[in-house]
Amino acid sequence: MFNFAVSRESLLSGFQWFFFIFCNTVVVPPTLLSAFQLPQSSLLTLTQYAFLATALACFAQAFCGHRRAIMEGPGGLWWGTILTITLGEASRGTPINDIATSLAVGIALSGVLTMLIGFSGLGHRLARLFTPSVMVLFMLMLGAQLTTIFFKGMLGLPFGIADPNFKIQLPPFALSVAVMCLVLAMIIFLPQRFARYGLLVGTITGWLLWYFCFPSSHSLSGELHWQWFPLGSGGALSPGIILTAVITGLVNISNTYGAIRGTDVFYPQQGAGNTRYRRSCVATGFMTLITVPLAVIPFSPFVSSIGLLTQTGDYTRRSFIYGSVICLLVALVPALTRLFCSIPLPVSSAVMLVSYLPLLFSALVFSQQITFTARNIYRLALPLFVGIFLMALPPVYLQDLPLTLRPLLSNGLLVGILLAVLMDNLIPWERIE
């Protein structure tokens, strides 16, 4: 049974959980607004959908899924893949409605597939493909892709087709760098009891400084317009985009196993078992499927939740659920949604950049499980550098590739992960000294 007893400590921890959920969610809608070339008035709707879906996904996991204090939110792998596909295909002239429709179909299929994997228990076997070597590459490349997104947000760069008339505004960028340095300084130099509030302090301080330094910045205007498929619908289907989305959903399952395994140390009384993984996959797939009409980034358990649990020392579901309730209230009250929508993208991007830098530490932890030599280093080096090359390759150079392969091959993160999975599981590296 769940204990609903309220204490001061659990409320404070719940508030910290809210800001963790908030910081990981609020930065996403502005990037979708830019990538899909939507009017500024759509930001309120996208943000409200994001908060609502994320809160419900957290509830689903807390009560029916893994039943642990692990945030369920817009997956970084999904986020990076969707932005990459949209930018690449739009630059080749593919209509935005076609991209949005194909992504919706692919995401729905991946949600169904994730549920089937959960019901069947196949996810445990699928997770075995993600060896420590694969996870090193996964963490490195995911960190590279996400930090690129955050740097673009700090610079105010467009997430869609490049605008030749765009000019970087140095004062806003300087403020975002100052916020980044503030959060880093708190985490590095302050005692742990203060350092754990670095994201919260950085967000609020940057928010206030922004409106003090740039008072002419307009606040969010417009009315809330509830609608299905706000990114676009009714377009032609692209098999390549659908295939890439389905593959992304399969790779995304690795986050489920990484998050649950990483929190086992906090829940020793629960023991090990496949049931928890199965329930979590079903919850993730179900929430991904039913939120397709809201056009939110598909979900996954956040491995970064481990850091918050370590910092706060509070592993209870109660605090996590309190944070999710606050997030739900923000989604249901338009005035609160409007308030949090006004946080500038450069500020939220700077805060999130700091929160994802520890992905490098995660990669180094996985690398300690492997003994690299001059001969077996190729299991990591080849997929890593191929993926980096494809991430930096301008989409125009893939123009002549078949439509079925183009979205996949333009995604360096996915290609690198798939190549690493193949090389690590097909070649007997343990026999190679």
Features from the language model and the residues they span:
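Membrane helical hairpin/interfacial module
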Residues: 58-123
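Membrane-embedded alpha-helical modules
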Residues: 96-216, 324-433
